[in-house]
């Protein structure tokens, strides 16, 4: 068999971009996108994407391999650009609309972006970002994504900064003779995403056509997404390209329900109006839904994929009681989508609801396309005991892993190591049944008296308190123990009787080992978060440093009072 070699017919580059062309053929007359009273079919979406792609080089002069950025929420243009930009042979860079101008300016310069599509509500943000470019530094062209938003008209001066509007490209583009640019190699870059920076400065993650193709299909299979689902975009498309579902929903001919902003009322209304079947949501969104005054049983089951921070069992229990069917996955920007999921076993359906929620809060096992997953000692690289207690670092092997960090070979080498593994920086235990459970980021593990304290475990106990809305636990220096847990808590709105710090601590003592109980609980109106909704623990650690703690007296200069 030695003469049987790969040939072009059996080794053409993998890419997710072909999903759109197929959707236009198979589901051409079916609804692809809904936004308020606007809707498109898959045939129309395909045509619109081709027209925009044709203009990116011919009208706007962007060359193959260069970067094009998008600063927009979950509106139809944002969805289309996930196809149109790479169909032009250039690299897509979705930027978070919640970032500040300084950060966006750094990202645009770091990526050397040549063109930025800007949503109407982000115009001032992007103009401020571009104004921060050093003198004589080339600035990207700007294209306006206009929207009929009441009271949000742009000034003539602002409009002068834009070469055209998005719909101008749709009108003048060529969908008849233009052929979308297929990658020469499946290893060619397709997207550039910046990490959220929960523990450090954001890094530019580059993914190939191959990795996106693999993780997209893998995520659909693992979640069991059927043909033609109705998918509600509660997950920002700028967050790792919506975990790959921007391309995945096209692969199965689904309907994308777009929304500019969301809260509990909007989500529940859209679910009922469009008979939504699927959505993705960070645990913070699940918490919002379960505590929403509009929360009531759903008219049909809604499958929800959650990820990011480990969801507390109490939040899962409350959300599922409304009719949401929660699946729990694990991934990072560096893997784009879900690569570890809590594969559900039928026999678990017979367990009490509280036990089901506990099992579902675990991250689980590798997805079908992720080749290997392990939890190892970060120093020796040896697998930890499968006892559900011994903590180690999650390591991965598989096609979903990024090419590397843009212009940062040192950071790339730190996580993609010579031993063949990708080191995630996430700390976990492996249970006897082979399911892993994240306990912390490596930087967030609290070492108290020689014991490893999982901040996630302490937070889960706090979340189970009926008055607690959000909780975050960080390490506080302690002269005797080395470190001790320090808790920040927000309480649910409308509480008639607000618990005291003493009552919260007593509650924790009933739930946790003595060395895991926080020494202090600080009540805050809100917790600092990244633009993707993750709690910024590094900010909380800085707050702790300023609070005048004295371990000998076990007191804080401030802190017992509300902040």
From Swiss-Prot:
Residues 263-328 are annotated as: SBD1. It is an enzyme of class 6 (ligase). Belongs to the ATP-dependent AMP-binding enzyme family. One of its GO terms (molecular function) is ATP binding. Residues 329-405 are annotated as: SBD2. The keyword Nucleotide-binding applies. One of its GO terms (cellular component) is cytosol. InterPro entries: AMP-bd_C, AMP-bd_C_sf, AMP-binding_CS, AMP-dep_synth/lig_dom, ANL_N_sf. ATP binds at residues 195-203, 328-333, 426, 438-441, 534. It comes from the Eukaryota. Both substrate-binding domains (SBD1 and SBD2) are involved in the substrate recognition, and are sufficient to confer the substrate specificity. Gene3D superfamilies: 3.30.300.30, N-terminal domain of ligase-like. The keyword Ligase applies. SUPFAM superfamilies: Acetyl-CoA synthetase-like (SSF56801). This is Probable CoA ligase CCL11. It is found in: Cytoplasm, Cytosol. Its main location: cytoplasm. Keywords: ATP-binding, Cytoplasm, Ligase, Nucleotide-binding. Its EC number is 6.2.1.-.
């Amino acid at each position: 068999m030695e003469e049987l070699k790969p040939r072009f017919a059996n080794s053409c580059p993998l890419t997710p971009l072909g999903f759109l062309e197929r959707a236009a053929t198979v589901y051409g007359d079916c609804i692809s996108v809904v936004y308020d009273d606007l809707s498109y079919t898959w045939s129309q979406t395909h045509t619109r994407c081709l027209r925009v792609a044709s203009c990116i080089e011919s009208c706007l002069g962007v060359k193959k391999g260069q970067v094009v950025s998008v600063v927009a929420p979950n509106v139809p243009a944002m969805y289309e650009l996930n196809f149109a930009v790479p169909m032009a042979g250039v690299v897509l860079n979705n930027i978070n609309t919640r970032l500040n101008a300084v950060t966006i300016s750094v990202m645009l310069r770091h990526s050397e972006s040549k063109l930025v599509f800007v949503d109407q509500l982000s115009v001032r943000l992007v103009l401020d970002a571009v104004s921060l470019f050093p003198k004589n530094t080339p600035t990207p062209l700007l294209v306006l994504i206009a929207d009929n938003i009441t009271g949000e008209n742009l000034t003539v001066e602002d409009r002068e900064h834009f070469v055209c509007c998005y719909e101008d490209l749709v009108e003048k583009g060529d969908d008849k003779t233009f052929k979308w640019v297929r990658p020469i190699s499946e290893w060619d870059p397709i997207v550039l995403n910046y990490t959220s920076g929960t523990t450090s400065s954001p890094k530019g993650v580059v993914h190939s056509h191959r990795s996106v193709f693999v993780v997209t299909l893998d995520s659909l299979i693992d979640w069991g997404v059927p043909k033609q689902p109705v998918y509600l975009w509660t997950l920002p498309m700028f967050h790792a390209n919506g975990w790959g579902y921007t391309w995945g929903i096209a692969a199965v001919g689904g309907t994308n329900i777009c929304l500019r902003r969301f809260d509990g009322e909007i989500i529940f209304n859209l679910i009922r109006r469009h008979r939504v079947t699927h959505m993705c949501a960070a645990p913070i969104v699940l918490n919002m839904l379960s505590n929403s005054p509009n929360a009531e049983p759903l008219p049909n089951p809604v499958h929800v994929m959650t990820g990011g921070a480990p969801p507390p069992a109490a939040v899962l229990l409350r959300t599922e009681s409304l009719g949401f069917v929660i699946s729990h996955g694990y991934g990072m920007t560096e893997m784009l989508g879900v690569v570890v999921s809590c594969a559900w076993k039928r026999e678990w359906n017979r367990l009490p609801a509280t036990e089901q929620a506990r099992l579902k809060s675990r991250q689980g096992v590798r997805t079908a396309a992720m080749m290997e997953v392990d939890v190892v000692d970060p120093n020796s690289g040896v697998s930890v005991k499968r006892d559900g207690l011994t903590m180690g670092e999650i390591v991965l092997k598989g096609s979903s892993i990024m090419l590397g960090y843009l212009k940062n070979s040192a950071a790339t080498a730190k996580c993609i190591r010579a031993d063949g593994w990708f080191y995630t920086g996430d700390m976990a235990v492996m249970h006897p049944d082979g399911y892993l459970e994240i306990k912390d980021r490596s930087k967030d593990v609290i070492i108290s008296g020689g014991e490893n304290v999982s901040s996630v475990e302490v937070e889960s106990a706090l979340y189970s308190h009926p008055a607690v809305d959000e909780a975050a636990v960080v390490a506080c220096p302690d002269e005797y123990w080395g470190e001790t847990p320090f808790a920040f808590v927000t309480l649910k709105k409308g509480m008639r009787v607000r618990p005291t710090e003493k009552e919260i601590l007593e509650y924790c003592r009933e739930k946790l080992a003595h060395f895991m109980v926080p020494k202090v609980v600080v009540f805050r109106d809100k917790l600092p978060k990244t633009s993707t909704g993750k709690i910024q623990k590094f900010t909380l650690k800085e707050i702790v440093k300023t609070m005048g703690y004295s371990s000998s007296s076990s007191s804080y200069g401030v802190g017992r009072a509300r902040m």
